[in-house]
């Protein structure tokens, strides 16, 4: 039995991906090295909504080789891609043409936050967060979860797990290279022992410690342990560091965790 979005119980795959959608980050900031937070609002005048925003961060403009009149595509999980145009005002850049359409499609509200990430010189990936820092992205569907559970995982000649479905190269390429500094690794070990309030997970857990399958939507799964600490919080242990390294997760990376339970406890990690 699993509660649906209205709180009613139904027979199906047990999942917390919709109700939980935790946005985990390692510091008080959710700014990735290639992204920034922009706050948006709305004004009502003559019955119409007007969206306004601050200038795009200089690092975002630089990474997408921005210039006055440049056309970009905004990509978000909440709506279809939107073509926009950059406009330079003084020393700052704003999104002009196409912005109103994007606001209407995503229904941006006062106090929400948009996190930009440059995926190519002409494409910006956007993650929309509410005022509490919780992602408003659409979680994996039941079909995604079922496909993931059926996906076979094999081992290569060295005994490492490898998936038959390589998935989007955007995910695969997010690997930590050998040039990564040891300082990054140390920070990762220190801050990435993921912790979650127990009240969100107790309906899925049967004991104080439970085995859990951790995976990205397209990558191989890793078996870890979800442990309840004395301060009534849950921690991912025994494998998180290797998982983070192999998926390019480091300090200030934003991760969204979708917990579910079928025949076993699992979590799908979205990496931004």
Curated annotation (Swiss-Prot):
Keywords: DNA-binding, Nucleus, Repeat, Transcription, Transcription regulation
SUPFAM superfamilies: DNA-binding pseudobarrel domain
DNA-binding region positions on the chain: 39-132, 180-272
Domain of life (superkingdom): Eukaryota
Cellular-component GO terms for this entry: nucleus
Presence of keyword Transcription: yes
A GO term for molecular function: DNA binding
InterPro entries: B3_DNA-bd, DNA-bd_pseudobarrel_sf, Plant_B3_domain
Residue ranges, compositional bias (Basic and acidic residues): 141-159
Subcellular location: Nucleus
Tagged with keyword Repeat: yes
Span list, region Disordered: 139-171
UniProt-recorded name of the protein: B3 domain-containing protein Os10g0323000
Organism: Oryza sativa subsp. japonica (Rice)
Source taxonomy: Eukaryota, Viridiplantae, Streptophyta, Embryophyta, Tracheophyta
